[in-house]
């Protein structure tokens, strides 16, 4: 649907993002903005308008950044165009936030007036300040009886270090004070700079694949303008495409026919090649190929690797296509083909964390209708061989033999944790259990900010869940990779009837290996169905067996027909049965159910 484009002077445009910790009310505030500026009629309104993915609505979290263009009339009578981007709050998606911020001049830092500042709001806020944005703190949930605005304003100034005495307060749920937030943001956030008459220069902030339209790109126009029918040039590929549609989301997909400097909107050029318009690339017109490329985004490195395999081998090609389509939309996803003796052909995928992995697997299963099975996730280890070569190990099967390795190193994460004083002891105990080393501690009002260096393998698994449960949900975490450090690491193999099962192997610290091995074989014992012969499950480090359990055979009562009978007759029948079971064991193979592969993930420490 096309509509007459309102031409707004560049000084009346405001581009901003909303950043906050999980559950501090970003998406609800976005809903209120849309409602007040008449983006949608009341009947079209629903909670979390911008979280369009089913998964986002179910879990109540934002995964993808979404952009919206609204028109707002200020009390001074001027009309402003607001382009805002709703960003995710979860630590696994912080790269989405930094991408969104590149398109803005300002950011609204939403803080829950009852909960106060949390680690993720601090991390995202620093990202915004580094990129030179104007940060406007806002206190949300002011209608709650437990809201303490004075304490929270003090916390924002203490912990983050930005002026917050005049921070607007609002309740996104009831709509109280939201008008004031809009007024303040128009006054505080600077207008974009750019020359509408200069040659076109635009940054691709995000892109996704539509089966009918091809690649849809979300762009921020720095200079110049782009119209429907223009011939555009993608700088990195050097290819030209005819623009078929240009417009904005308000939040409905609305064609406007032209986008001008300072604006954020979508461009569709019928690009069918999945890699035709990479995120972070610059587009210009084919008549001005000399326009400089804008600085893109730094590539994010995956922190967790896991094998994903289709249950049905014939799904391998559709699976590859699905991953490629998902990768346009999710630049942090990495994958390469892998084969496993136990699971067949699949892909080794790299993710930013466990939540990211879960989301990707769930999106593949829902949106592309695939049945997938995953192997145990591992982090990337660094090994130095005796010849002096450095190799990176992202899967236990790639672990070289101990005789050729000089040094094994594991990744260390720097974790910043914010926790109320009364839970400090529990959190410290948890960090030390996870082989953490304390680096710093600051008391800020009622909150304590602690910094630990913890091995990445301990952080990405279930550290976040454990941290939440030992602090009743009050602690918050932000972490980033800092370096590799030498460590005593071993590979634990799982043998079933003497044969190694590659998909069940894991790499862990030598001190943990024994009890993790025992816990794993005990768990496997419950999950592998009983066979007609004994099944031995063993955990081994190299040639040394560290744990064993046996799934007992099902057996028929061969003595049932003997009644009184002679004892030697009974012995003969039992010996015959034993002989048969032995023969069966030599030729029998054991089916391992999917749950058994997942057991590796769930082994408690």
Swiss-Prot record:
Q: Where in the cell is it found?
A: Cell inner membrane
- What residues form the membrane-spanning segments? none
Q: Cite the EC number.
A: 3.6.5.n1
GO MF annotation list: GTP binding; GTPase activity; guanosine tetraphosphate binding; ribosome binding; translation elongation factor activity
Q: Which InterPro entries match?
A: EF-4, EFG_III/V, EFG_V-like, EFTu-like_2, G_TR_CS, LepA_C_sf, LepA_CTD, LepA_IV
How this chain sits in the membrane, per its record, is: Peripheral membrane protein
Identify which top EC class this enzyme belongs to: hydrolase
Q: Which residues bind GTP?
A: 23-28, 140-143
Q: Which reaction does it catalyse?
A: GTP + H2O = GDP + phosphate + H(+)
Question: What Gene Ontology cellular component terms go with this record?
Answer: plasma membrane
The segment(s) forming the tr-type G domain are: 11-193
- Which keywords does UniProt give here? Cell inner membrane, Cell membrane, GTP-binding, Hydrolase, Membrane, Nucleotide-binding, Protein biosynthesis
What is the predominant subcellular site recorded for this chain? membrane
Q: Which GO terms describe its biological process?
A: positive regulation of translation
Lineage, top-rank taxon, reads Bacteria
Q: What does this protein do?
A: Required for accurate and efficient protein synthesis under certain stress conditions. May act as a fidelity factor of the translation reaction, by catalyzing a one-codon backward translocation of tRNAs on improperly translocated ribosomes. Back-translocation proceeds from a post-translocation (POST) complex to a pre-translocation (PRE) complex, thus giving elongation factor G a second chance to translocate the tRNAs correctly. Binds to ribosomes in a GTP-dependent manner.
NCBIfam families (UniProt xref): lepA, small_GTP
Q: Which family does it belong to?
A: Belongs to the TRAFAC class translation factor GTPase superfamily. Classic translation factor GTPase family. LepA subfamily.
**Protein's name according to its UniProt entry:** Elongation factor 4
